[in-house]
């Protein structure tokens, strides 16, 4: 079956790392092992958000390609449960475990999923955090890399599986293709941790959704001009 006949879902996650000072001493030593300068130590401490062993998923955004309906599941610091809509997008708060359960429940409705850099970040992160939370993964988010019938990772596709000298951010790809970057509204992925500390949970959720809207537009270019 050709992929344009398949129901597609685009998804993206946002994560926040643990407080470095709360790690046990062995874990601290592990992260600081190769950090020699103060700058390198700060960088190592800030890297906790990149690893499923030391971070939580605080937001998962999902966007149906065909209908433009969106679902954003997000943590709100354990506050009162929230549910609201903005246009075609439903925002639902919950714990990390509830976020992941909602993700897997929604994912079963689609045959193909689209990410940007999902193979090296979002997909393994979701699978491992699900296991850590005692949630059985119901689908392999890491299928064979060199086929895109099930998973289209646009970072892989647009660099022709790392044939280019380097990878580029979603922001730079958006600029190249004339797509509105999710960063244009004053927030970047590097600010997620600070926004979370400031209890700006809904701002993070909206930022995540801007990411997947941009990913959808980029996917349309790839599908029309580069897909074989």
Listing of model-derived features with the role each one plays in the protein:
Residues 2-98, 105:
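Conserved RNase H-like, two-metal-ion catalytic cores of nucleic-acid enzymes
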Residues 26-27, 99, 192, 203:
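A general marker of short, structured functional hotspots
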Residues 2-7, 55-58, 63-68, 73-87, ...:
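Metal-dependent phosphoesterase core characteristic of DEDDh/y 3'-5' exonuclease domains
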């Amino acid at each position: 079956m050709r992929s344009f006949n398949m129901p597609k879902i685009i998804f993206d996650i946002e994560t926040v790392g643990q407080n470095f000072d709360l790690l046990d001493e062995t874990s601290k030593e592990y992260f600081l092992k190769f950090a020699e300068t103060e700058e390198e130590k700060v960088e190592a401490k800030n890297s906790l958000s990149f690893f499923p062993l030391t971070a939580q998923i605080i937001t998962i955004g999902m966007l149906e390609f065909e209908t433009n309906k969106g679902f954003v599941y997000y943590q709100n610091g354990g506050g009162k449960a929230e549910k609201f809509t903005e246009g075609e997008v439903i925002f639902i708060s919950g714990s990390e475990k509830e976020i992941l359960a909602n993700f897997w429940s929604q994912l079963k409705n689609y045959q193909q999923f689209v990410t940007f850099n999902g193979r090296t970040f979002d997909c393994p992160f979701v699978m491992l955090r699900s296991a850590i939370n005692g949630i059985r993964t119901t689908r392999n988010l890491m299928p064979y890399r060199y086929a895109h019938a099930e998973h289209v990772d646009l970072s892989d596709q647009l660099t022709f599986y790392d044939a280019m000298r380097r990878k580029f951010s979603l922001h730079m790809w958006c600029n190249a293709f004339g797509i509105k970057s999710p960063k244009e509204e004053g927030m970047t992925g590097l600010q997620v941790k600070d926004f979370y500390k400031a209890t700006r949970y809904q701002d993070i959720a909206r930022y995540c959704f801007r990411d997947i809207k941009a990913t959808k537009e980029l996917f349309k270019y790839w599908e029309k001009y580069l897909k074989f």
